């Protein structure tokens, strides 16, 4: 008799999506050699957001040495609940999920992708150290090869108030009882010739023969945060070489994640996604909110009079949000009526409310921070409300009014150092007040040409001693990939 195999159906935990180089490349959208940029970008974004939410002008320190990268801030301190959620790999917890807004991190699961990194790049000693709210967490995260589940070790100790930080984050005083310091740590790798390598694909980061392009990219990524955030004071400590960019306007403001979002930024599929997220949350917490309570979350609908008009037009007085689910599906027809009523009784948001970096700040940054010639500095700002047809709802006449603000700045370095690395073209790009790891402006409108091609046409090639900055504030920034390497810009 011919032998027959009765295959067993095996279940693999989705927790494994974070515990290998391949999976983390998928989650972050970046190869291992770019993970140091991912670490800095995500942690500085989180630090700046936390300070803004607390009404504190952010002060952020980025420290890099042979065995670690550390980000420290002066914010309110990472909540224990947020840390615990980031270490639960069975769920995805995010305060950004579902909302449409000009926030720095729309995915909101940055910490979850960062915690497994130390053991992926250094299986023996890699670890994460978090200091916040008077406690020091030494965290190691790995995967059990048999059960394929996450194994999390979090050793917690109180930080004596009289002692300095264990992280050695320069000599800048940081009140760790009210701030957060996160250090990704690995074993130092120094070669006989003095070259120091990081375990991210063997990157040479310090020494005579180190990869200058990497060091330059790392530095420019850090500096980009200061360029696009006038209220930020940024300290950079690269192997003991320190640089500080002071805030030019500590009271500068922008649209915050805690600000109510505008219904004019939503199309039907966006509102359905948000409603579904609220219903799921209410089921998990034993609630069943009214549509009226849901409306309070939106810009221009905090007053009862406006809400009553919306509810009357939509026929949803005393209607519960869960009633918008019929036989296991969202009632798109009723939600479309609700969306139309919400837009009819509110005003679109003016583009200036998103936040404007401003000419004064950029001039000071280009001249004092980067060394550009004052007389060469140029600045441009374009703002508008973009009319986007709502094709999903089937009614092309109805539209979303999406505000946007694009700012650009140019400066000439002078070329006095005869081809030095700092005297080549430097491009800084960002969206929603966060700097980009790669230039995301790959295609403008219908021409298909990107930023570099546009600069080349203006005789500003890669070898020219200039600095160019481009920033877009937009509540519905869309990227072509998870790594945010290409932004979609309509023309």
Question: Could you tell me what each predicted segment is?
Answer:
Residues 99-102, 234-239, 292-296, 308-310, ...:
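Short coil/turn segments at secondary-structure boundaries
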Residues 34-42, 77-81, 105-112, 123-125, ...:
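Charged, alpha-helix-enriched surfaces in structured cytosolic catalytic cores
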Residues 1-6, 148, 152-155, 160-164, ...:
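Charged regulatory segments coupled to nucleotide-binding catalytic modules in large multidomain enzymes
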Residues 47-50, 89-93, 117-121, 224-229, ...:
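Conserved, well-folded catalytic cores of nucleic-acid-processing
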Residues 311, 323-324, 336-450, 460-461, ...:
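Prokaryote-biased recognition of long, low-complexity C-terminal linker/tail segments
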Residues 1-177, 181-182, 294, 298-303:
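GHKL (Bergerat-fold) ATPase N-terminal catalytic module, capturing the glycine-rich phosphate-binding loop
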Residues 61, 70, 77, 112-113, ...:
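Structured core elements
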């Amino acid at each position: 008799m011919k032998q027959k195999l009765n295959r067993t159906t095996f279940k693999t935990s989705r927790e494994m999506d974070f515990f290998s180089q391949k999976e983390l490349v998928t989650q972050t959208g970046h190869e291992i050699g770019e993970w140091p940029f991912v670490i800095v970008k995500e942690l500085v974004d989180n630090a700046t957001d936390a300070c803004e939410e607390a009404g504190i002008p952010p002060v952020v320190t980025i420290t890099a040495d042979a065995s670690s990268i550390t980000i420290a801030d002066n914010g309110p301190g990472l909540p224990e609940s947020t840390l615990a959620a980031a270490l639960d790999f069975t769920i995805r917890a995010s305060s950004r999920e579902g909302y449409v807004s000009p926030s720095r991190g729309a995915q909101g699961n940055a910490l979850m992708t960062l915690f497994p990194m130390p053991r992926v790049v250094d299986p023996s000693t890699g670890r994460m150290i978090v200091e916040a709210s008077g406690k020091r967490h030494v965290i190691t995260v790995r995967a059990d090869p048999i059960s394929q589940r996450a194994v999390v070790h979090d050793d917690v100790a109180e930080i004596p108030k009289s002692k300095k930080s264990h992280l050695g984050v320069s000599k800048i005083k940081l009140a760790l009882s009210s701030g957060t310091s996160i250090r990704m740590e690995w074993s130092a790798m120094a070669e006989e010739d003095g070259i120091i390598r990081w375990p991210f694909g063997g990157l040479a980061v310090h020494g005579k023969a180190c990869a200058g392009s990497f060091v330059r990219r790392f530095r420019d990524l850090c500096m980009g945060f200061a360029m696009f955030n006038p209220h930020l004071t940024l300290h950079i400590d690269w192997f003991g070489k320190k640089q500080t960019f002071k805030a030019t306007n500590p009271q500068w403001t922008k649209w915050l994640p805690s600000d109510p979002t505008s219904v004019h930024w939503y199309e039907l599929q966006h509102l359905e996604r948000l409603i579904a997220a609220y219903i799921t949350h209410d089921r998990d917490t034993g609630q069943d909110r009214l549509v009226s309570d849901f409306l309070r979350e939106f810009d221009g609908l905090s007053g009862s009079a406006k809400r009553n008009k919306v509810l009357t037009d939509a026929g949803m007085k005393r209607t519960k949000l869960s009633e918008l689910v019929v036989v296991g599906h969202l009632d798109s027809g009723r939600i479309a009526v609700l969306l139309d009523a919400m837009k009819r009784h509110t005003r679109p948001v003016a583009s200036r409310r998103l936040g404007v970096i401003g000419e004064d700040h950029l001039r000071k940054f280009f001249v004092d921070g980067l060394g550009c010639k004052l007389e060469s500095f140029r600045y441009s700002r374009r703002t508008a409300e973009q009319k986007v047809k709502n094709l999903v709802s089937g009614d092309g006449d109805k539209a979303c009014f999406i505000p946007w603000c694009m700012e650009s700045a140019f400066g000439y370095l002078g070329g006095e150092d005869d081809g030095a690395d700092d005297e080549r073209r430097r491009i800084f790009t960002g969206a929603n007040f966060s700097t980009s790891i790669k230039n995301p402006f790959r295609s403008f409108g219908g021409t298909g040409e990107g930023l570099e091609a546009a600069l080349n046409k203006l005789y500003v090639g890669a070898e020219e001693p200039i600095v160019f900055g481009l920033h877009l504030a937009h509540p519905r920034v869309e990227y072509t990939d998870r790594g945010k390497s290409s932004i979609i810009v309509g023309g």
